[in-house]
Every structure is written in structure tokens, then in C-alpha cells.
């Protein structure tokens, strides 16, 4: 057992369902990635889940961001694999107070290019009424203002899934799950977490790969993985659809990550670069490095890119949130394991009351 955890237990803490931490190994580059293989694993995982539970309809909230874009691509691939009609993919975009024209447009274009019908449901009116009902002024951009939007979207998706006898596909990725960067019982919850085993940096790589494969229009791996539209029409129509989806996807890849709960939000301005967080996830959870070793390894690898001050602040954020937000991981939906570990309780967990100072 890790000596830090022994000290924690001696001080009165309990392990609960903590998975045994590995002995400290040398730091390594995080999450070795072949985008085609990651995508194929996600497609296979979703297809297997749908087949086992006998469901032919899925519901997805498409925001125009990276995570929901990848889930939509995986759903198209899984439906192709199962020979299911693409009409069983129900996409919804739910603009709120911080939604930008760029993300809304990209959500529309991506769905159109893939041949997926999408419905727009504005949450502004219902959230304003909810905030009024609970005595909120509807203007102060506090936690209730932001989280009520995320929970309203989840409520809509869950009810829509009930209406079609389907399941809600979760969009949260492995990095967000590690950090608890989600709204409890909002985007935190779904019926199957398609991205739960894929960190943010890999989500970006897979989306970029998909767009480049599709944009070639040569009928290569991308079409075999479900890129080819299932809608009827000639070759030129399919080619235009692929081109439209690829163009939208490349702009999504270039868009700063944001939940868009208030205007101008940029996630990495608040929590630090996802490139660092994914490095910390891999080297803490898999390689067992402690705080000092993590900092030294990150400084050596990323010092010139991010600077030592940002590395230190991001590491503090990572360790604090990894522990303090563990309660969200303790009641998360099933997902797909892509790499050698994930944040399911059967794979890797940590006491949510552990003092981060011992890490």
C-alpha cells in the first residue's frame, strides 16, 4: 500500500473502495493514442450496450463543443455497425444564456452533414422561471445560475429519452470526470457515458482525425467506421454531407473549450490547460507519482510551453479537485474503458475526504 495512504489511515481515514495505487514509476507521456482505434473502441462499446439492452434509440445533447460532437460521431458509427436507421439518433441543441452563435451554428451543421435530425429547444424561458421560483434574481451569475441551466438540459434529455424509449448518451470526458468539472445531476448524469474513458486531449485528436478522414472523401477508414451518411441520395450528396460535417468539426476542434453557461467562459482560463491535467491524470493514477514528482516531470516536459507558475497552480487544482469531487465519480453512469484504467469504482477511486496535502 502507498505510504501516503498508510499515513492517512493512521490519522483516522478509511480506504473505502480505494483501488491500490501503483508504486511510483517514471513519468511518461500521457495516453498513447491511435485516434482510429479509440474511435473504434467507442463504437464497439456503444454498439454492444445497445444490442445487450435491446434499445434502438439514443438521445444526445449537441452543444457545438468537442465532447458532444464525438458522442454524435460514435453514435453514427454504432448505428451503422448495428444496421439501425439513423432516425433513431435524436439530437437536441438547447441554447441558454451563454450560448454563442459559433457553437450553435456548428451544432446545426454537424448534424445536417451527418444526416441526423436535430431539434432546437431553448432553455432560457424555463430556467428564468425556475430561478424566479427559487427566489433567485435571474441576473447574478453564481453557481445556481450556471448549474440550473445544466440541470434543465439534462431534465429535457431524460424526458425525451422516455418519450422514445431510448437512453441518454453522456458526453462528459475522462478529464472532466477526474476534475468533477460538471454539474452534479446535470451533465454529470446520463444513461451511458460514451466519453468517460477518453481524456479531453484525446477527444480533440479523435475529432480532428475523423474530420480529416472524412474530408478526404476517399471512402477510407472513416467510412468503414460510420462516416458515410445513411441517408439516401447519390454520391455527390454524401460527399457534400461529409464535407459539411468535416468543416464544422474542424471549427469545433479550434473552438476554446467552454460550458457556455455565461457569455465568454473559457474553461482552461479557470482550471488550467487540459494538456497538463491529462499528464497529471496519467502519471498520478497510473504511474503513482506524488506531488513533487508530478511537478518536476511536468516542469521538465512543459516548462517552456506553460511556465512553472501555471504548472504549479494547475497541479494544485488537479489534486484538490481529484479528491474533493470524488463524490461525483461515486455515482456516475456506466461507460467504456478505452485505456488501461478509468474512473469507475472497479478500476480507480480515492477517498473523497482524503487531505490533499499528503499526496
Regions found by a protein language model. Give the residues of each.
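Intrinsically disordered, low-complexity repeat regions of secreted/extracellular protein precursors
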Residues: 216-238
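ATP/NTP-dependent adenylation/nucleotidyl-transfer catalytic domains that generate, transfer
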Residues: 1-64, 68-217, 238-359
Amino acid at each position: 500500500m502507498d505510504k501516503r495512504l498508510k499515513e492517512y489511515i493512521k490519522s483516522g481515514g478509511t480506504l473505502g473502495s480505494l483501488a491500490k495505487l501503483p508504486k511510483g514509476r517514471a513519468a511518461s507521456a500521457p495516453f498513447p493514442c491511435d485516434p482510429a482505434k479509440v474511435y473504434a473502441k467507442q463504437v464497439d462499446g456503444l454498439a454492444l450496450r445497445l444490442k445487450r439492452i435491446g434499445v434502438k434509440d439514443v438521445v444526445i445533447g449537441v452543444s457545438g463543443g468537442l465532447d458532444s460532437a464525438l458522442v454524435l460521431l460514435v453514435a453514427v458509427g454504432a448505428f451503422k455497425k448495428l444496421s439501425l436507421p439513423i432516425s433513431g439518433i435524436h439530437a437536441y441543441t438547447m441554447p441558454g444564456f451563454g450560448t454563442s452563435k459559433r457553437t450553435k451554428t456548428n451544432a446545426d451543421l454537424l448534424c445536417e452533414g451527418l444526416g441526423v435530425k436535430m431539434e432546437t429547444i431553448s432553455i432560457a424561458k424555463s430556467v428564468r422561471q425556475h430561478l424566479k421560483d427559487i427566489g433567485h434574481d435571474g441576473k447574478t451569475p453564481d453557481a445556481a445560475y450556471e448549474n440550473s441551466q445544466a440541470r434543465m438540459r439534462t431534465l429535457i434529455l431524460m424526458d425525451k429519452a422516455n418519450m422514445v424509449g431510448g437512453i441518454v448518451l453522456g458526453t462528459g470526458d475522462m478529464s472532466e470526470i477526474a476534475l468533477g468539472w460538471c454539474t452534479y445531476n446535470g451533465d454529470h448524469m446520463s444513461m451511458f457515458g460514451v466519453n468517460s474513458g477518453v481524456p479531453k486531449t484525446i477527444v480533440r485528436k479523435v475529432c480532428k482525425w475523423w474530420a480529416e478522414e472524412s474530408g478526404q472523401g476517399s471512402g477510407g477508414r472513416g467510412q468503414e467506421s460510420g462516416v458515410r451518411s445513411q441517408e439516401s441520395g447519390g454520391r455527390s450528396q454524401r460527399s457534400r454531407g461529409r464535407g459539411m460535417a468535416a468543416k464544422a468539426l474542424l471549427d469545433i476542434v479550434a473552438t476554446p473549450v467552454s460550458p457556455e453557461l455565461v457569455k465568454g467562459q473559457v474553461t482552461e482560463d479557470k482550471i488550467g490547460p487540459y494538456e497538463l491535467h491529462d499528464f497529471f491524470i496519467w502519471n498520478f493514477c497510473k504511474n503513482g507519482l506524488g506531488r513533487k514528482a508530478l511537478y518536476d516531470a511536468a516542469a521538465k516536459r512543459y516548462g517552456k510551453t506553460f511556465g512553472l507558475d501555471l504548472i504549479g497552480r494547475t497541479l494544485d487544482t488537479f489534486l484538490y479537485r481529484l479528491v474533493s469531487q470524488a463524490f461525483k465519480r461515486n455515482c456516475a453512469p456506466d461507460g467504456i474503458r478505452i485505456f488501461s484504467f478509468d474512473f469507475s469504482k472497479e478500476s480507480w477511486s480515492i477517498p473523497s475526504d482524503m487531505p490533499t496535502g499528503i499526496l
